Amino acid sequence: MEAVLTKLDQEEKKALQNFHRCAWEETKNIINDFLEIPEERCTYKFNSYTKKMELLFTPEFHTAWHEVPECREFILNFLRLISGHRVVLKGPTFVFTKETKNLGIPSTINVDFQANIENMDDLQKGNLIGKMNIKEG
């Protein structure tokens, strides 16, 4: 099987960008629904300075997600599923960032948890999450 790469026209670029915006909105909604919390616990925005799509959580979420043991795995798996990209756990804060290329297409999602990580050795070695690739076009 052969893959043929073609340059996207303006309409295709716009459609792809819209798809990723919708995916982020859907992620936000699913996380809020999954936690069954009446108030919104996360919001997403495009940071024009850093050129990153960010999914930001309120401080209340940092404690709320502990009440749902499956929440961390659910979020990681869902983000991998919708993006097809690598998901990395790191850092002291709980912020999702999505780096974008020049077309606004995400290339990486960093998932930072403010929480107790069970195995810090795995975290430091970067062994927690595997890599997934997708073909876009």
UniProtKB/Swiss-Prot annotation:
Any one annotated GO CC term: host cell cytoplasm
One biological process term in Gene Ontology: symbiont-mediated suppression of host toll-like receptor signaling pathway
Keywords (A to Z) from UniProt: Host cytoplasm, Host-virus interaction, Inhibition of host innate immune response by virus, Inhibition of host TBK1 by virus, Inhibition of host TLR pathway by virus, Late protein, Viral immunoevasion, Virion
UniProt entry tagged with the keyword Transferase: no
Subcellular compartments: Virion; Host cytoplasm
The keyword Glycosyltransferase belongs to this UniProt entry's keyword annotation: no
Main location: virion
Induction comment: Expressed in the late phase of the viral replicative cycle.
Transmembrane feature ranges: none
Domain of life: Viruses
Family: Belongs to the asfivirus A137R family.
Summary of the function given for this chain in its UniProt record: Plays a role in the inhibition of the host innate immune response. Mechanistically, promotes the autophagy-mediated lysosomal degradation of host TBK1 and affects IRF3 nuclear translocation to block type I IFN production.
Assembly notes: Interacts with host TBK1.
Name under which the protein is recorded: Structural protein A137R
Organism expressing this protein natively: African swine fever virus (strain Badajoz 1971 Vero-adapted)
